[in-house]
């Protein structure tokens, strides 16, 4: 089960990457995140914790990181893993941003549907919030120039 949401944001990809890299401030643009932190650099293998606005915090680990392009974090509890992939690519007038979410593990069949429902409801709001956050803090690119 994969969930994906896309949006165009009128800022360069490096602006989005800079926002993503500031993990302690994820809650400023992601209404479904109460707190996030890493115990080290924003790099593959670094562990941390993410606490959703509703629910308990879970450990997370950075599984993929390509500066200026993408990152994937994995939240986990025993026998259930939540994968959150984020990509940004250059586009006319700014950037195309995609967030993908999927679940693995022996208990994915049990926890996946409930978590998927929350993600499907929240992800469009999160993407709109990221767009507003990025464009309010950085001058949007004018595609007419």
Question: What does each model-identified segment do?
Answer:
Residues 54-56, 64-70, 79:
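Short, charged/polar surface micro-motifs in flexible loops or helix N-caps
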